[in-house]
Structure formats: C-alpha cells, structure tokens
A protein has these predicted regions:
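Short alpha-helix
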Residues: 181-196, 201
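Conserved class I S-adenosyl-L-methionine
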Residues: 65-75
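N-terminal, positively charged/glycine-rich alpha-helical extensions of SAM-dependent methyltransferases
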Residues: 1-34
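Conserved beta-strand signature within the Rossmann-like core of class I S-adenosyl-L-methionine
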Residues: 163-170
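Conserved alpha-helix/loop element of class I SAM-dependent methyltransferases that forms part
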Residues: 45-65, 82
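Class I SAM-dependent methyltransferase SAM/SAH-binding core
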Residues: 70, 78-123
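A short acidic, Gly/Pro-enriched loop at the edge of an enzyme's catalytic core
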Residues: 126-134
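A short glycine-rich, Lys/Arg-flanked "PGG" loop and its adjoining helix->strand segment in the class I
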Residues: 150-162
Length: 243
C-alpha cells in the first residue's frame, strides 16, 4: 500500500464485526460456501463472475492488464483468485482483511506477488485516486453502524481513480434468521456513493431456496425465477470528469 493520511475508523464497530464472525458456525459456512460441495454456491459464483465481466466490459475494460485493484474484506481470497484468472496482474492487486486467520489462508493460496494486509480497512494507507476498482463483496451488510459504513464508503471512494469505480455485491433484503447482517438495497448503495453512476444487476437465487433444490435444477431456477434473486452486483463508477 502507498501512503496517504489515514481516516481513523470507529474501533468498536470493527471489533463488533470480528465478534459477529466469531459467533458463526465455521463448519456450516464451509459447507454452504464450498464451490465443490455446494451446487448453489457454485451457481452463484459463476453467475456473479459472468455479470462482473459483463459490467466491466460494458465499461470499456477489454482486459485488466495494468489496472490496480483492492478488495476490502477479502476473506480467504476467492475474489482475488478470480481477478487473477480474469487477467489482472498479481503485483497490482491487494486485499484488506480484518480477521487474521482468513488473511493467513488467503496468503497461503494466492500468488506471492499479491499483498494481503490485516487490519481495519478504514485506516488503510492507500493513496487517493490510485485504484481502478475497489471490491466490496458482502461487506456493507456486515456493518450495522451506519456512520461507520458511510465513513468506510467515503474512504473507498477516495481511493478510486476517476473513471474507475467500486464493485459492490450484497444482498438486498434483511435476513430474519441472522440479526448480524442488514440488507443493502440499491437506495443504500446510492446513499453510500452519491456521486457515482450506478450500473446494477439483480442476481443470485435465494440461497435457502437454492440449497434445497436438486443439483440439476439450481441453474435453471436461477435463470427462470428472477423474483427469487436476493442480491445485487453494482458497479459504482466515479466520473472521469467532475460533473
């Protein structure tokens, strides 16, 4: 990371996020989100990746060479792996992760040239205007403090170069079974990035539904039942010229 004046983050919310993750059932998460074991997770990942590519190609990015990317909340590195497979250069990628054990897993599996940093992203030292894209996948829904969420979004927006953007993937409705998350409808993404041009797609068959389907029906139902899509992938673009 390059240096800039960091924006201090409210430590209590970062600590609260870590505590929420500690309460989760790690074994159940591993089963639900395994691309090998879960047909619904594999379908969701493939659909998300196709939509991601469509949004960026429509933006005029026909390849990713020479572009700089940061993922906030990179977890075990799955999206960073996808970026490498899409043609991004590892030395131009970095991940920020709050939880040390997840960051360690990412470092163990990602190319050595790719940097993974542990800590609170809101205080990360990243030069303003240095990133072509910042990724936030199921990040904002984990931040229940609206002021913290807004401050982090503003920080991420500062990192983005004109003509780049923030790629947000999150669910749009509240999960009544999980009080540790909050739905992120398009209106909230617009509030977080008020100066962005938003390009958004509704995707991802509701996971509780998808997990109950036979493997052969997951992809057809994801395509044919748009009213059961629970997530959005939104490309929030920073104008190349001030409006």
């Amino acid at each position: 990371m390059t240096s800039s004046t960091p924006t201090p983050a409210p430590a209590p919310e970062a600590q609260a996020v870590a505590a929420r993750y500690a309460r989760r059932d790690a074994a159940q998460d591993a089963q639900h989100y395994s691309l090998y074991a879960s047909a619904s997770a594999l379908q969701a990942q493939q659909e998300r990746l196709r939509t991601w590519v469509q949004l960026w190609r429509a933006h005029g990015w026909h390849n990713l060479a020479g572009l700089h990317f940061t993922e906030v909340g990179c977890g075990s590195g799955g999206n960073l792996h996808d970026l490498v497979r899409l043609g991004a250069e590892p030395q131009r990628l970095q991940g920020l992760e709050l939880l040390p054990e997840r960051a360690a897993h990412a470092r163990a599996t990602l190319p050595a040239a790719l940097s993974v940093h542990v800590g609170d992203a809101a205080s990360a030292a990243i030069e303003h205007g240095s990133q072509h894209a910042v990724l936030a996948f199921t990040l904002f829904s984990s931040l229940l403090d609206a002021r913290f969420r807004t401050a982090l979004a503003q920080q991420m927006w500062q990192w983005v170069a004109p003509g780049g953007g923030v790629l947000v993937y999150d669910f749009v409705v509240n999960n009544p079974r999980n009080p540790d998350v909050q739905g992120m409808p398009l209106a909230e993404v617009r509030r977080l990035f008020p100066h962005a041009r938003l390009h958004s797609r509704r995707i991802t068959l509701a996971p509780p539904v998808a997990r109950r389907l036979p493997r052969s029906l997951v992809a057809p139902c994801a395509s044919l039942l748009p009213f059961l899509r629970t997530h959005r992938l939104t490309w929030a673009v920073k104008p190349a010229q001030p409006s």
